[in-house]
Each structure stands twice: as structure tokens, then as C-alpha cells.
Amino acid sequence: SDLVLAPEHKATEELIAASGIPSVILRNNWYTENYAGDIAQARETGVVAASVGDGRVASASRKDFADAAAVVLLEDGHLGQAYELGGGIAWNDDNLAAAIAEVIGGPVEYRALTTEEHAEALESAGLDERTIGFVTALDAGIRGGALADTDGTLARLIGRPTTPLVEGLRPLA
């Protein structure tokens, strides 16, 4: 993955492999709960602003990921496997805005920002330079497709469809 977090995750997986301890690697995509701040922003402003362009995210709920972890811990046949886990649908920020509008009961629009506009907005909000760089790098990764993969592995492991975006956002509203 080109996502800014990928090198740390890769290094962790390499250390686990080098340890010789039997393991299963769960590569969780984005958590739907990561969008709690977007709900608050949208409630206040009617806008979800980001520099992800039309990038897509196959997020899933913490419960979906936790259920998958329980399955691989409790069922035989998973040792040595690495699973790419994502939600059943890869959505864009227009879809996110519509889902947030549904859960808060008011209009919400997605405002696509350039990376520079996003950095300026984050700076105006008081974020430090390192955090701004991290957030805009995450959005660049999403814009580039780093979180768009959805192959059904998570749903197969948990034996049910993953939690739809709007249902994952509802408890956060």
C-alpha cells in the first residue's frame, strides 16, 4: 500500500514473521468510526471537506473487524494466513456526505479541496505541521486508491455482510 501508515504495519508484520511465533495477520482497512469528526463537522457546517478527490474507502465497523479476529482465533485453519479485510462497498466522500446527512437529519455536502487548501484549513483550525502532513498524506493515499479494495474476505470470515456505511455512522451521531 502507498498509505502513509503502511511502512509501520509492514515492519510490524516482518517482526512477527521473524519471531517464529505462529500467527495470523489481519490487515484491517479503514474503520467507519474514524468519521466521527466528520459527523461533528457536518452537523456544525453542513459540509464534509477533504482532499480525497473521488477516492474510495472500503471501511468497516470495529465490530466487523472484531468479529473477524474472533473467527481466526477460535477456528482452525487460519495460522500462517494474511487477510486483507475491508467493507463490502467502497464509497466516496459524496456517499459519505449523503450517509452523514441521513444520520444527522440535515443537508450535508462534500467539498473537495486541493491538498494545499486542505493544509491551509487544517492550519487555520490550529493543527501543527506534522499533523497536517499526516492528514493530507492519508487523504492523498485515499485519493490514490489505497483504501478502495474490497474482495469480500471480511464478509466471508464473519459469515454475514459487513455493516453498511450509514449503519456504522448512526451510533456516532
Report each predicted region and the residues it spans.
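Residues that recognize and position ribonucleotide moieties
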Residues: 24, 41, 58, 89, ...
